[in-house]
Amino acid sequence: MVSIRPDEISSIIRQQIESYDQQVQVSNVGTVLQVGDGTARIYGLQQAMAQELLEFEDGTIGIALNLEEDNVGAVLMGSGYGIQEGSTVKATGRIAQVPVGEALVSRIVDALGRPIDGKGPINTNETRLLESPAPGIVARKSVCEPMQTGITAIDAMIPVGRGQRELIIGDRKTGKTAIAIDTIINQKGEDVICVYVAIGQKASTVAQVVDTLTEKGAMDYTVVVSASANDPATLQYLAPYTGATIAEYFMYKGKATLVIYDDLSKQAQAYRQISLLMRRPPGREAYPGDVFYLHSRLLERAAKLNDQLGGGSMTALPIIETQAGDVSAYIPTNVISITDGQIFLSSDLFNAGFRPAINAGISVSRVGSAAQTKAMKQVAGKLKLELAQFAELEAFSQFASDLDAATQAQLARGQRLREVLKQPQNSPLAVWEQVAIVYAGLNGYLDDIPPAQVTTFTQGLRDYLRNSKPKFPEIVGNEKKLTDEAESLLKEAIGEFKQGFTA
């Protein structure tokens, strides 16, 4: 009979206990109570954080937006068709991040930074938080460098500086996107990284924009972020933050960046949809109470950094669509108050054939004048005033039959200045070209040229300067100001070209 030794048994048990090593996985899990319309209500998830990423059973990712006493409200970043009532949801412990880096340049990505251009994966290991804090007061510096748009009317009267936020506002089909695209095209050779964010647009429209940028060689320094109209509202709401995050990476590397949000009205509508589905109380125009913060925290990320942080900049050109020119609606007034000025596009001017259809009277740049090139400042100082006076006189002259010679001269000058500022799409001008034509218009050199021929004259003058007076573009390009020598060359060129033009 085998004798049982208690000490041997106890040592075996002790060994077994010591060698027992089971990995315990603790996860924050919840259950779907209700799902539909791109939102889900989840029971559990006691430790969920605001804006935390949640993973559903079918692989769909959501974001925790409402943290309530007994449930969590989440928005889905997918269709959610595979999610059922009672299915499990896991908290990931991560806040939304997007990939960033040089590899994104010349690519088209969705609101989560995933490539959608069919050119394979994006090779980058770096990510940034989707919602990063904006640079503080000490980190910033005054706007001091120009961001040339290549559009004479803007660069002369409503100049934009690097690090500025300039709103482009107007009715549908007034050329808002055209101004933004021209600005991107004009950054060629300027070492500026551009990010174009398309929010809630037709996929065909985005494809057209990409074609234009590719044709002009602008995709080499541009990232396109697209959340089209058939994407979930969550992605349309997140897309602008993705664009800002991608640009922020380059800004902190000391580069100049330009971000275009086309357009923030659709982002606000997507956010309104999400908020109403999450049963948040509606406010004015049914928008939630924090819709101002939605845009202010986005646009505050645009800045000109100080030299200690590398002197990089992020210039924001948000676009807002108005209804029948109503700039006093909720979202337009919000964004006007956040930005550093606005470029107002008028459908009346557009239909009358004045393109870009910029209404100089109510367009303003609050900080750009500090960044305007000296040459343009010297030349275009009186331009806005002249055009404003002309607009007033034009309205008055419709009722007056006999006008004195001075008024007639001012009306004639105004008509020609308006013609000078007309510009075809996708053909931005260099600073010296803008300086030359504005100088000719303001100093009366075009007064005896019929308005219908002003465009032909200015085009010819630019070609004449380029070929016969190459020193003029060189001086203005290098010195950034209109020196006496440059001015005499310009006067000479205008005189010589005019003789041949009128002969």
UniProtKB/Swiss-Prot annotation:
The keyword Oxidoreductase does not apply. It is found in: Cellular thylakoid membrane. It catalyses: ATP + H2O + 4 H(+)(in) = ADP + phosphate + 5 H(+)(out). Pfam families: ATP-synt_ab, ATP-synt_ab_C, ATP-synt_ab_N. One of its GO terms (molecular function) is ATP binding. It is a peripheral membrane protein. ATP binds at residues 170-177. The keyword ATP-binding applies. PROSITE patterns: ATPASE_ALPHA_BETA. It is an enzyme of class 7 (translocase). CDD domains: ATP-synt_F1_alpha_C, ATP-synt_F1_alpha_N, F1-ATPase_alpha_CD. Produces ATP from ADP in the presence of a proton gradient across the membrane. The alpha chain is a regulatory subunit. PANTHER family: ATP SYNTHASE SUBUNIT ALPHA, MITOCHONDRIAL. This is ATP synthase subunit alpha. It comes from Gloeothece citriformis (strain PCC 7424) (Cyanothece sp. (strain PCC 7424)). The lineage of its organism: Bacteria, Bacillati, Cyanobacteriota, Cyanophyceae, Oscillatoriophycideae.
